[in-house]
Amino acid sequence: MAAALATSFFCGAAPARAQVTSEPSAVVFPDPAKFATGLYTEGEFGGLWFNGPAGNDIGAGFAVGARVGYDFVRFFALQAHLVGSTHQTQGDSAVAGQLLQMYQATVEAKATLRLVQLSFFAEGGLGFARMSSNLLYALGIARYRTGLTAGGGGGVDYHFLSRHFSVGLRGGYYVLTEVHNSRDGMVTTYLRYTF
């Protein structure tokens, strides 16, 4: 062992010499042209609240949703959106403290402005909203459990260096036609995968 150490000490390698022939290359920014386009899916979660008469009797709730869409060109897409949320009635009525779920299904158009890894978008569409029970009828706010909904929103999307994944934050505002003069607002964060 001592002989091996002595040999490596006295017969060690010569000092290394390196030659620099050019400056190091700059950081390579991602090329948005290489980001995947076409069919995509999104999973989202966040909060949903009611405005108008329904907002006085129904508290804000947790929302979970999904989107499936198709980018026809880099700046325009069509998508189907499903979201469900759970709420609790509030106030001093006989139905206070009861749980209520709302389900919304919409078909939306989406316009996007891409700036390297960031993109800003606006979206809007039409669809249906359905309540899980007749609590709103008991409160005198709605006649039917199912009705039309229309609205829109927008947000920001951050694309990773991977060509398939991005994350984002979006907000939306929808009119509920069967809930007297009421609307719902939603803020969600999402993960997107483009095939």
Question: Where do the protein language model's features map onto the residues?
Answer:
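Short glycine/proline-enriched turn or capping motifs at secondary-structure junctions
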Residues: 164-165, 178-189, 193
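Short coil/turn motifs at beta-sheet boundaries
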Residues: 34-36, 59, 100-102, 117, ...
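Gram-negative (and chloroplast) outer-membrane scaffold detector with strong preference
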Residues: 42-47, 62-139, 147-150, 158-160, ...
